[in-house]
């Protein structure tokens, strides 16, 4: 096959017409290609999946996929990379800010060593319908009766809670004068509870069943208190590195579409439909606590929202 550039060196008696043809052809090759002729590069989302317990992870991942699918027509294809490294909360946030290893991450707050909230977009959309802060109490099954008799904050303060060191719940519980035993690894909490190192493990009503289920048999069986829960305002948001504004814009657009067409509600019901059945029994005494990590105004707003949405299904008792 003749090299088209070699035509430029043809003898003069053949050159002028062919040279004009080649120049026109080369000029056309240099024109920009339209979006219809060349597909745009896919959105590359590097999603950190280890920030929460197994009771929330499946829903959170499916929600990210839903938001990306809802915007496929407007924003094109995507590549979703799951980052499941065992990182501390602060390290995962720092990596998210850089936007290289991780660029998308669920979080309840953005603080910690070497962490700067100015480096992420916090999408304002509701993720868990105000129920993340409604904490079921996972206890040893042989101590369920001890938690049947808790009706006031000072009664719960006689027991010790267990928490992971870098969770925001630690500051909330300690602020409300609830004794807390800490560990750096979430996987240590259940064996510690079984060994009487502390008395209860407060986890969201959404995740507690999945977390306790593998430990609900045998002499050291764990169970969820059917009579006592606590609530403190704790919202979860999808956060995106400010190095990736297009991802933040796309996920925000996906939230709008999925909220309007009801698909977020359907996804929530798929994963957490059991909560409505549980609340309908109207047996839970729920102790209301304040969250010192947010403003008094925000505390008041979120507590009022919880009471409005779920108050008819639970007996609420305010902290002293």
Task: Outline where the language-model segments fall.
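Extracytoplasmic small-molecule ligand-binding "clamshell" domains
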Residues: 38-118, 251
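A ligand-binding cleft/hinge motif common to bilobed small-molecule-binding domains
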Residues: 96, 104-118, 200-221
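Periplasmic-binding protein-like
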Residues: 50, 130-136, 140-143, 213-252, ...
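Short helices/loops that flank or line small-molecule/ion binding pockets
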Residues: 82-104, 175-176, 187-206
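An extracytoplasmic/periplasmic, membrane-proximal ligand-sensing/linker region
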Residues: 259-320
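A conserved helix-loop-strand patch within extracytoplasmic ligand-binding domains
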Residues: 124-169
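Short loop->beta-strand "edge-of-pocket" segments that line small-molecule binding or catalytic clefts
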Residues: 41-57, 148-166, 200
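Ligand-binding cleft/hinge of the Venus flytrap
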Residues: 64-79, 149-155, 164-185, 212-219
């Amino acid at each position: 096959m003749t090299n088209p550039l070699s035509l430029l060196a043809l003898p003069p008696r053949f050159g002028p017409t062919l040279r004009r043809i080649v120049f026109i052809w080369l000029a056309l090759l240099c024109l920009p290609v339209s979006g219809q002729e060349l597909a745009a590069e896919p959105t590359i989302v590097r999603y950190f999946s280890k920030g929460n317990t197994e009771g929330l992870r499946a829903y959170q991942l499916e929600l990210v996929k839903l938001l990306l699918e809802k915007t496929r027509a407007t924003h094109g294809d995507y590549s979703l990379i799951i980052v499941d490294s065992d990182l501390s909360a602060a390290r995962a946030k720092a990596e998210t800010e850089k936007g290289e290893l991780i660029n998308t991450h669920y979080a309840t707050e953005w603080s910690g060593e070497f962490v700067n909230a100015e480096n992420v977009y916090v999408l304002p959309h509701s993720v868990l319908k105000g129920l993340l802060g409604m904490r079921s109490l996972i206890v040893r099954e042989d101590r369920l009766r001890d938690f049947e008799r808790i009706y006031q904050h000072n009664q719960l303060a006689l027991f010790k809670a267990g928490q992971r060191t870098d969770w925001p719940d630690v500051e909330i519980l300690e602020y409300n004068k609830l004794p807390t035993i800490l560990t750096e690894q979430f996987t240590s909490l259940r064996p510690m509870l079984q060994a009487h190192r502390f008395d209860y493990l407060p986890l969201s009503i959404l995740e507690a069943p999945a977390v306790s289920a593998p430990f609900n048999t045998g002499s050291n069986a764990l169970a969820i208190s059917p009579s006592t829960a606590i609530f403190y305002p704790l919202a979860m948001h999808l956060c995106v590195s400010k190095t990736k504004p297009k991802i933040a814009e796309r996920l925000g657009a996906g939230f709008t579409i999925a909220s309007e067409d009801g698909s977020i509600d359907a996804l929530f019901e798929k994963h957490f439909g059991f909560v409505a059945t549980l609340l309908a029994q109207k047996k839970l005494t729920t102790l209301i606590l304040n969250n010192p990590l947010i403003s008094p105004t925000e505390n008041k707003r979120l507590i009022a929202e919880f009471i409005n949405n779920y108050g008819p299904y639970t007996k609420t008792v305010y902290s002293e």
